[in-house]
Design a protein with these regions (language model features):
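Long, contiguous, compositionally biased segments that the model treats as domain-scale units
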Residues: 1-171
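The feature marks a conserved, polyanion-engaging helical scaffold used by nucleic-acid processing enzymes
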Residues: 176, 180-309
Length: 309
């Protein structure tokens, strides 16, 4: 047996009532954290985590207006993968690439253009980290999930420590100094902190709440945005702009054989020309936030049944 409940001799019902995923400690489970679920939640602590992410993005955006040295990019943008949560798509074990120099450089160059109205949005209810993945700036789904996991790591560590102190013996845990736990805005640096955490096979373990997890794609994603271009365009309040965008999109589909690839390329070209469409797409996704929570429940249940039960 390789699951957390087996290794630490905890009944599955205890993990279930706590709300934590019963992770495998042999291979990653194909789930990841979707930051949209923080925004969509009614839990005050999740909504605060969403705000904390925006605060850090605001810090990065403001700093991006000047010169950023490679040392600061490394300090502010690069993170190791939080492999101790045993989530992701590794074929064996729980190793991953994390967020390295390429991610840091891509994001530092893009952040001002992607978030001109950060925390002061005029179309959407709020800002969303996932907007970075809608631009072709070298930031994809895995980057978004890894970045989110690092930005809420303090919460996840506290969540795990609380469980460990309540349900595990001291022999099953270890007092660990974890790096890059929280950001000190006074010193502009990530700080370490100690936690009492479950310990197995030479490393600590992090538990993750089920209601933060999804599979395949984040709720806000570029693939669906391209697929729903006509829906997005129809939601525009400006009739003239809506007609102009439709004309530009349809003129790219004049070939006799209209393929999915051609439609995808036409949608991508149109969105690149009218980036305001991204904001209206995000607005639609905000309005559908209850569906995001339902999808999360369904995919977590399906993974639970296939990989655990």
């Amino acid at each position: 047996m390789v699951y957390f409940s087996d290794i630490f001799n905890v009944d599955e019902s205890i993990l279930e009532s706590y709300g934590a995923m019963n992770i495998s400690l042999l291979n990653d489970i194909p789930l990841f954290i979707d930051p949209f679920l923080l925004y969509a939640s009614e839990k005050p602590e999740y909504r605060q985590l969403h705000e904390n992410i925006l605060d850090y993005l605001s810090f990065l955006r403001d700093k991006a207006s000047g010169f950023i040295s490679s040392e600061k990019i490394k300090r502010w943008y690069t993170f190791p993968e939080v492999k101790q949560n045993w989530l992701g798509y590794s074929e064996s074990g729980n190793g991953g690439l994390g967020l390295g120099k390429d991610f840091g450089q891509s994001m530092s160059k893009a952040i001002q253009g992607v978030f001109p109205d950060l925390k002061n949005e005029k179309i959407t209810e709020t800002s969303h980290l996932e907007k970075l993945s809608l631009f072709k700036v070298g930031v994809g789904r895995d980057n978004i999930s890894d970045f989110t996991c690092n930005l809420i790591k303090k919460y996840l560590l506290e969540y795990t420590q609380t469980f460990a102190m309540q349900y595990l013996s001291l022999e099953q845990c270890k007092n660990i100094a974890v790096s890059k736990v929280y950001f000190d805005y006074k010193y502009e640096n990530w700080m370490s902190q100690k936690y009492i955490l479950p310990y197995f096979n030479g490393d600590y373990v992090i538990l993750t709440p089920k209601d933060l997890l999804t599979k395949d794609e984040t709720w806000i994603n570029a693939s669906e945005m391209r697929h729903r271009l006509l829906d997005i365009t129809s939601s525009l309040p400006n009739d003239e702009l809506r007609d102009q965008i439709n004309d530009i999109y349809l003129k790219q589909l004049t070939k006799k054989k209209i393929t999915n690839k051609l439609m995808n390329e036409a949608a991508a070209n149109t969105i690149a020309r009218f980036p305001i469409l991204m904001d209206y797409y995000i607005k639609i996704k905000e309005e559908e936030k209850e569906n995001a929570k339902n999808v999360s429940k369904e995919v977590v249940l399906s993974v639970d049944e296939v990989f655990i039960r």
